[in-house]
Amino acid sequence: MEKKFITTQGAPAPIGPYNQAVLINNTLYISGQICLDPQTGNLKNRDIQDETHQVMQNLKSILAEAGMNFSNVVKTTIFITDMNQFSEVNEIYGKYFNGDFPARETVQVSALPKFVNIEISMIAVQSW
């Protein structure tokens, strides 16, 4: 089993003892991303749309570092603090995929790191 740690400056550095992503054989496991701007380290959290866009951009950068894109994503997990924002999240999230949506669950949680409103993790597979 080949294991490689994926790190890019296009996504924020981890805020705890974990890696941005781990590639094992042809499967990429991406740690949950929040709305930190990788250049400034500041939160982009004016509203749920801004947060979701920044999270998706962070995920896009990690995918690219591993030679992948959103078409390689097979599973996502979305954590949100307010299920009333579900449709707004879906509107932004859906724009990053070309209609071939991965499997997914969305879970409401009481709080997230740095008091953001959304966190998304992904699993992607290199073309077979």
Labelled PLM ranges:
Residues 2-128:
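Short, polar/acidic, helix-capping and beta-turn segments at strand->helix junctions
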